[in-house]
């Protein structure tokens, strides 16, 4: 077909120009049939809707818009999460700071003693370590240097990681199979001390020196090397660069949580006085006082199931006051009736989650005393039976213990229910022993009981309980 043929278009008369406009900025060889994609020039009209070019150019823009929106939402959620985390951390820090203030509005006398201890530490009158025992415990002093309390930090307990006594460390290293007491919750001794004081106050026994959970910091406590280095670094920063040092929440050593028990004066180990009373018998009235105080110790130890009660960790105060108010011209003095009181200390190994059933039975050593063979008196029955026979009283006691025990960072609700089940069983046995006019010796020979809350699929306003007896005995049984 020649160029003059009517089938040839006039536009095709000239050879096609495959070069791009100079404004495009692209230079490609003029090859017929070459496919290239050219960016639209500024001011050029949009592609017709529905054309392939239009879809290809619009799709990335939509994807970018959606991606930007999703990224914005993610950043918003992350910012909200960070804000919530910051609020939670601030709330936790505020709660911790509130606890560390050691405020006891329900017991202003106890709070005043704690303030004296804090003031003494500020004046560099530090607590003094007690070298007896298997844990880190300290005599706390007032600004005048007098002993006012005994402090037992949580992390310095017999099985704590900062226990300064090497005996437990050696036992753990050489005999791990016999390390610890599997019937107890480890590192909860400070709560056990405070719990025993709570039970004592609820039952109005008045034999446990008031004990509560307190936070204290002292140079004489056993801290890790890291804590001491951090404390020295913060103090140095505060001295050298005050603007930086003032930003720290705490400058000194971190406070330790532990049990703070008021110190009792004039008491000696029960073993000392019991041996003396055996050699020098007491008058009848004085011996009666000792028996009534002894019964209170039995009630307390049995309810909390104290696994560490010997005759060397409860105290007796024997006071024989002399009345010298008579005339100085005479040599006569009037001797008043002696006064005997008992103090139950060292209650850190109580509230087990099961009755001892492995190697040792952890008996009550007071069960071998002659006072344990005497039936319970009417005075102790009148004091205790109305309380422990009332389900509402027992329930209130459980709730108070729950509020105390849940303060521990490692609190486990399941373990607490097991502890309460053991305590209910002890209360059940004690109630029956008091009603049957039994003696403390007969009480400890009763079979161990566990009273658990019955599980029911139906909701009920009242709780039901299941009672079970423990048949397994420890390898080294004492009865």
From Swiss-Prot:
Its EC number is 2.7.1.67. It is a lipid-anchor. GO terms for molecular function: 1-phosphatidylinositol 4-kinase activity; AP-3 adaptor complex binding; ATP binding; magnesium ion binding. Residues 31-45 have a biased composition (Low complexity). A lipid is attached at residues 174-175, 177-178 (S-palmitoyl cysteine). Changing residue 163 to A: Reduces enzyme activity. Palmitoylated by ZDHHC3 and ZDHHC7 in the CCPCC motif. Palmitoylation is cholesterol-dependent, and required for TGN localization. Changing residue 345 to A: Abolishes enzyme activity. Changing residue 172 to A: Abolishes enzyme activity. GO terms for cellular component: cytoplasmic vesicle; cytosol; dendrite; early endosome membrane; endosome; endosome membrane; glutamatergic synapse; Golgi membrane. Residues 130-136 are annotated as: G-loop. Changing residue 184 to A: Abolishes enzyme activity. It catalyses: a 1,2-diacyl-sn-glycero-3-phospho-(1D-myo-inositol) + ATP = a 1,2-diacyl-sn-glycero-3-phospho-(1D-myo-inositol 4-phosphate) + ADP + H(+). Pfam families: PI3_PI4_kinase. The modification Phosphoserine is found at residues 5, 9, 44, 47, 51, 462. Residues 344-364 are annotated as: Activation loop. Keywords: Acetylation, ATP-binding, Cell membrane, Cell projection, Cytoplasmic vesicle, Disease variant, Endosome, Epilepsy, Golgi apparatus, Intellectual disability, Kinase, Lipid metabolism, Lipoprotein, Membrane, Mitochondrion, Nucleotide-binding, Palmitate, Phosphoprotein, Synapse, Synaptosome, Transferase, Ubl conjugation. It is an enzyme of class 2 (transferase). Residues 165-178, 268-276, 359-368 are annotated as: Important for interaction with membranes. It is found in: Golgi apparatus, trans-Golgi network membrane; Membrane raft; Cell projection, Dendrite; Presynaptic cell membrane. Belongs to the PI3/PI4-kinase family. Type II PI4K subfamily. Associates with the BLOC-1 and the AP-3 complexes; the BLOC-1 complex is required for optimal binding of PI4K2A to the AP-3 complex. Interacts with BLOC1S5 and DTNBP1. Interacts with FOS; this interaction may enhance phosphatidylinositol phosphorylation activity. Interacts with ITCH. Interacts with ATG9A. It is linked to Neurodevelopmental disorder with hyperkinetic movements, seizures, and structural brain abnormalities: An autosomal recessive disorder characterized by failure to thrive, global developmental delay with intellectual disability and absent speech, seizures, hypotonia, inability to walk, orofacial dyskinesia, involuntary movements, and structural brain abnormalities. Membrane-bound phosphatidylinositol-4 kinase (PI4-kinase) that catalyzes the phosphorylation of phosphatidylinositol (PI) to phosphatidylinositol 4-phosphate (PI4P), a lipid that plays important roles in endocytosis, Golgi function, protein sorting and membrane trafficking and is required for prolonged survival of neurons. Besides, phosphorylation of phosphatidylinositol (PI) to phosphatidylinositol 4-phosphate (PI4P) is the first committed step in the generation of phosphatidylinositol 4,5-bisphosphate (PIP2), a precursor of the second messenger inositol 1,4,5-trisphosphate (InsP3). This is Phosphatidylinositol 4-kinase type 2-alpha. The lineage of its organism: Eukaryota, Metazoa, Chordata, Craniata, Vertebrata. The gene is PI4K2A.
């Amino acid at each position: 077909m020649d160029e003059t043929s009517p089938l040839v278009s006039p536009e095709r008369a000239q050879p096609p120009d495959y070069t791009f406009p100079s404004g495009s900025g692209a230079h490609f060889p003029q090859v017929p049939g070459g496919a290239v994609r050219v960016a639209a020039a500024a001011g050029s009209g949009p592609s017709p809707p529905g054309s392939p070019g239009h879809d290809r150019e619009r799709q990335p823009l939509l994807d970018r818009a959606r991606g930007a929106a999703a990224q914005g939402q993610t950043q918003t959620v992350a910012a909200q999460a960070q804000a919530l985390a910051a609020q939670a951390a601030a709330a936790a820090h505020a709660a911790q700071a509130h606890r560390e203030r050691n405020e006891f509005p329900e017991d202003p006398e106890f709070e005043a003693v704690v303030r004296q201890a804090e003031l003494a530490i500020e004046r560099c009158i530090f607590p003094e370590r007690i070298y007896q025992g298997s844990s880190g415990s300290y005599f706390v002093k007032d600004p005048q240097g007098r002993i006012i309390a005994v402090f037992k930090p949580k992390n310095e307990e017999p099985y704590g990681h900062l226990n300064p006594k090497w005996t437990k460390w050696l036992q753990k290293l050489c005999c791990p199979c016999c390390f610890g007491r599997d019937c107890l919750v480890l590192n909860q001794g400070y709560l056990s001390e405070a719990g025993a004081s709570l039970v004592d106050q609820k039952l109005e026994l008045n034999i446990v020196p008031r004990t509560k959970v307190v936070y204290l910091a002292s140079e004489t406590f056993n801290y890790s090397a890291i804590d001491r280095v951090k404390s020295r670094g913060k103090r140095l920063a505060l001295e050298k660069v005050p603007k930086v040092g003032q930003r720290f929440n705490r400058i000194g050593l971190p406070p330790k949580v532990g049990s703070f028990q008021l110190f009792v004066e004039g008491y000696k180990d029960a073993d000392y006085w019991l041996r003396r009373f055996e050699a020098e018998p007491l008058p009848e009235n004085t011996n009666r006082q000792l028996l009534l105080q002894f019964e209170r110790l039995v009630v307390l130890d049995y309810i909390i199931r104290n696994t560490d009660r010997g005759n060397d960790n409860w105290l007796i105060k024997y006071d024989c006051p002399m009345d010298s108010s008579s005339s100085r011209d005479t040599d006569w003095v009037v001797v008043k009736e002696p006064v005997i009181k008992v103090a139950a200390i060292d209650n850190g190994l109580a509230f087990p989650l099961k009755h001892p059933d492995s190697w040792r039975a952890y008996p009550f050593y007071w069960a071998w005393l002659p006072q344990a063979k005497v039936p319970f008196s009417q005075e102790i029955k009148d004091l205790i039976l109305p309380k422990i026979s009332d389900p509402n009283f027992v329930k209130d006691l459980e709730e108070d213990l729950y509020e105390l025990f849940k303060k521990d960072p490692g609190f486990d609700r399941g373990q607490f229910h097991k502890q309460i089940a053991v305590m209910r069983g002890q209360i059940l046995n004690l109630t029956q022993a008091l009603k049957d006019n039994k003696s403390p010796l007969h009480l400890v020979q009763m079979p161990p009981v566990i009273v658990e809350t019955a599980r029911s699929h139906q909701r009920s306003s009242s709780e039901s309980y299941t009672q079970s007896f423990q048949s397994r005995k420890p390898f080294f049984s004492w009865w």
